[in-house]
Amino acid sequence: MALLQISEPGMAPAPHQRRLAVGIDLGTTNSLVAAVRNSIPEALPDDAGRVLLPSVVRYLDKGGRRIGHAAKEEAAIDPRNTIVSVKRFMGRGKAEVEGAANAPYEFVDAPGMVQIRTVDGVKSPVEVSAEILATLRQRAEDTLGDDLVGAVITVPAYFDDAQRQATKDAARLAGLNVLRLLNEPTAAAIAYGLDNGAEGLYAVYDLGGGTFDLSILKLTKGVFEVLAAGGDSALGGDDFDHLLFEHVLAQAGLEAAALAPEDVRLLLDRVRGAKEALSAAPQARVDVKLSTGEKLAQTITRDTFAALVEPLVQRTLGPTRKALRDAQVSAADIKGVVLVGGATRMPVIRDAVAKYFGQPPLVNLDPDQVVALGAAIQADLLAGNRSGGDDWLLLDVIPLSLGVETMGGLVEKIIPRNSTIPVARAQEFTTFKDGQTAMAIHVVQGERELVSDCRSLARFELRGIPPMTAGAARIRVTYQVDADGLLSVFAREQHSGVEASVVVKPSYGLGDDDIARMLEDSFKTAEVDMRARALREAQVEAQRLVEATEAALVADGDLLDASERATVDALVASLRALAPGDDADAIDTATKALAEGTDEFAARRMDKSIKRALAGRKLDEI
């Protein structure tokens, strides 16, 4: 009989084999994949030694496609079928992207997320992104020599629920198991913090091709705590390109609408090259021969470019101020500013950041790679490859408050913005009318006091509530945000146990500038919002009291004499007349008068109920 072999603790090969997991930065302009090898995170190159994969997909007829560098090189000759900057379309509706600057595509009017018509059929941003992710997955498996157990994919901190869900769908389509969606600034902080052993308050300024994020983090002995996040989900390096593009056209006396799609793409490519050249040189040339035979030849100086894009630079500082305010710190408290994203190579950006924070930004890690490196570290940890130096904790946040609609169109915030995730919060609500057997749950996102000023995320109904008097039912509504920033909502009637739930998957996400506008509006209109909320609350309470009093009069009006009945009727009529108005103080006064004027009536009703309950019963039965 063969003896069973038992290895010494920690020596058995199979259980302690490293599980292969990667970090992927799915970028607007470029994407890349990284992995931890020999305890060091590194970006994985392709066969030609190139780390960056252009986020470009060209569709050919009969199912053919080119991805990355090959597609980028052919973008000018086939612009309608070559999809670039697809990240800007993730989770967006057709109405939100039709104004996309100089986009040569034919957008298809389909329900939910925008679709793009190509020679190979209609494609969604999820499908296009999946092509890029599948290419990176194949690169990783070829380099590492085995299948992946999963990936951590980075997303802008200001991506909303729909955009995050679209990213997960693209990964699933690409054959990737998503271990975590990780906010890009947080990934950068992980890479920087672990690389440098940094501690203290840090700002991560992340300007990519299509999005801007600013996060304030506190690094303390391996704990990465995000204190606040701000940003603009529709601002990135592409916008700098388009401003310079429009400038070059204006100087030549041309308009974009008059150019052929291939000329638009060619000129954009040349303009982008000039922008990148200005990071190292005081001036750059734009030389283009259009399909009409006309030649454009211009010299762009760094000063001209800086003046041109100054409004965009200032747009990044607004969310920066808000994030600092939310974190309750000042620019002077920040120990270092980490730059992320290829667009931060522009001198105009580095100068603005240095001026605002009073110190030069940290640039010792490649801004194109730092996000993927941080994601790789997190992926390695989530895959179970923990080593002695991996005792660190990540605490990320949600960027906007999540709430529920209450009577009168008011918003009751369940999870406030900048709450650490994962998080679950619950609150109890009740019914508004007697005999109410259903409740509509309306999930909203934003900082304002009224539902009409916030973003609607989802609606669902809780049915089967036992009929009770108004206010007797107890409905517990629980909001749960997972580590990927995705929301689920549960409602439960406490007496009967009736339940309903929804995983929030809106058909498409927030429009351009919506999140930044929501926050800005909430600060500008806080006083107006509070007055509006006070009015709505007064109106709701007035309506509740009028209906309750009228129901009581129908049931027990005989408890009042003619004079008392006339007094109550007058108070009800007065409150009913005032309730639709806009004088909250007058409504409150009339509500208080009716409540006090019916105190004696309520006491008589209580006595009647007690007598009815005790009728025919002996003392020892009570």
From Swiss-Prot:
It holds the Pfam family HSP70. GO terms for molecular function: ATP binding; ATP hydrolysis activity; ATP-dependent protein folding chaperone; unfolded protein binding. The lineage of its organism: Bacteria, Pseudomonadati, Pseudomonadota, Betaproteobacteria, Burkholderiales. Keywords: ATP-binding, Chaperone, Nucleotide-binding. The keyword Iron does not apply. Gene3D superfamilies: 1.20.1270.10, 3.30.420.40, Actin, Chain A, domain 4, Substrate Binding Domain Of DNAk, Chain A, domain 1. It comes from Burkholderia pseudomallei (strain K96243). Belongs to the heat shock protein 70 family. Chaperone involved in the maturation of iron-sulfur cluster-containing proteins. Has a low intrinsic ATPase activity which is markedly stimulated by HscB. Disulfide bonds: none annotated. This is Chaperone protein HscA homolog. One of its GO terms (biological process) is iron-sulfur cluster assembly. NCBIfam families: HscA, PRK05183.1. PROSITE patterns: HSP70_1, HSP70_2, HSP70_3.
